[in-house]
């Protein structure tokens, strides 16, 4: 999955009895939890990818395939129009959405947080409004997935300043719809077992069946499903929080960790420390990525945190100190190495829009948070943005 594109099979059975069924259940669960909702009196703005014909086959982002294949029933509740939703160029798509949807009764958003934030900023630029409630006063829901939402929450709350706004997490990957947040009082998701997916889990080299998982353990996810995948490792890791019913929380990617110096830093550690540092310094982080800085004859090793701020901290030094302190508190291996082979992290701040522009140029939808070498970090640092978004 490190290539520019990965090709996986998509069958009509998986589109209807996995992905579409998952979306319908999201609507049902949201309605059950919010009986006074009026979200269905308007439309859900869905920011999809693009697709095209390769021979007789339709190939593209799953979101675009879903929009293309389900238009006849979901078109009543979704914006923008199909031909706009699957425009390949992001700038052109945003401009078209602004023209088409500003006057629409939008009550919900759905999609990946980072791309939706970029669209929301474009809408505010287009309309000259201060926040999205001045554009769409009936907004009440954002169904999000694809990445950890916590780093984006503050930005969304500033753009949509309403206590009535609800955020619902879904685990809807290209390979299948796997879980959703069914209980607003909890921070985990219910694993959906009747969507045509057979789950197995890997712990080290051991393959564990669903009935053998343990709470508190992190597992890599393997699926055999109705889209033709057979014992396929999707690249995600999850932690079980309950086994009756089965509940999970997203723990990161199997390849996203840093262990160059024996520090065993994982995404969960990084997210926890970053949020704590933001709370202590008033910062809001848009995007970040971490890479190792290798040891030399004269210098110890370190981690370089490349950070794009939505709102900068009151002091970068205090932010760096807080980040380091929290990492040491949550990861004993990191703390031990900080006393020997590791210096405090190096903080590199980049201009707003750098990460999004890099993703667009590389055809990626997500920023790799932790990378065990410097390939991604050096690309991002060398990348020149054409504009600040």
Segments from the language model and where they lie:
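Active-site glycine/GP-rich loop and adjacent strand/helix microenvironment
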Residues: 63-389
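Conserved ATP-dependent adenylate/AMP-binding module captured primarily in the ANL superfamily
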Residues: 20-35, 95-104
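Conserved adenylation A10 loop of the ANL superfamily
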Residues: 1-8
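Conserved AMP-binding loop of ANL adenylate-forming enzymes
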Residues: 24-73
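Conserved substrate/cofactor phosphate-moiety recognition/catalytic segment
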Residues: 8-22
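Short, solvent-exposed loop/turn and secondary-structure capping segments
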Residues: 8-10, 57, 121
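A general alpha-helical scaffold signature found inside nucleotide-binding enzyme cores
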Residues: 18-21, 25, 265, 269
């Amino acid at each position: 999955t490190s290539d520019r594109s990965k090709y996986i099979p998509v069958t009509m059975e998986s589109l209807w009895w996995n992905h579409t069924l998952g979306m319908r259940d999201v609507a049902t669960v949201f309605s059950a939890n919010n009986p006074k909702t009026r979200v269905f009196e308007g439309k859900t703005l869905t920011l999809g990818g693009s697709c095209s014909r390769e021979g007789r086959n339709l190939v593209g982002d799953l979101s675009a395939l879903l929009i293309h294949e389900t238009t006849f029933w979901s078109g009543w509740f979704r914006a923008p129009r199909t031909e706009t939703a699957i425009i390949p160029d992001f700038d052109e798509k945003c401009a078209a959405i602004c023209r088409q949807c500003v006057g629409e009764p939008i009550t919900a958003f759905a999609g990946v947080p980072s791309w939706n934030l970029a669209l929301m900023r474009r809408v505010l630029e287009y309309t000259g409004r201060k926040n999205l409630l001045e554009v769409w006063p009936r907004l009440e829901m954002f169904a999000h997935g694809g990445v950890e939402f916590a780093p984006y929450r503050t930005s969304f709350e500033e753009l949509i300043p309403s206590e009535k706004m609800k955020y619902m997490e879904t685990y809807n990957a290209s390979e299948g719809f796997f879980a959703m947040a069914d209980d607003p009082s909890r921070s985990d998701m219910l694993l959906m077992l009747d969507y045509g997916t057979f789950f197995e889990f890997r712990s080290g080299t051991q393959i564990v069946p669903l009935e053998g998982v343990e709470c508190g353990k992190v597992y890599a996810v393997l699926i055999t499903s109705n889209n033709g995948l057979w014992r396929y490792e999707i690249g995600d890791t999850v932690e079980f929080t309950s086994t009756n019913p089965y509940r999970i929380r997203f723990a990161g990617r199997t390849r996203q960790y840093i262990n160059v110096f024996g520090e065993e830093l994982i995404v969960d550690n990084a997210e926890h420390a970053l949020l704590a540092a933001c709370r202590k310094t008033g910062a809001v982080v848009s995007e970040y990525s971490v890479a190792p800085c290798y040891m030399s004859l004269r210098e110890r090793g370190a981690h370089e945190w490349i950070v794009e701020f939505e709102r900068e901290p009151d002091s970068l030094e205090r932010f760096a100190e807080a980040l380091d302190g929290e990492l040491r508190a949550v990861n004993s291996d990191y703390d031990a190495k900080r006393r020997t082979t590791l210096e405090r992290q190096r903080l590199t701040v980049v201009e707003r829009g750098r990460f999004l522009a890099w993703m667009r140029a590389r055809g990626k939808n997500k920023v790799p948070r932790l990378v065990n070498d410097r390939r991604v970090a050096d690309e991002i640092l060398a990348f020149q943005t054409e504009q600040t978004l």
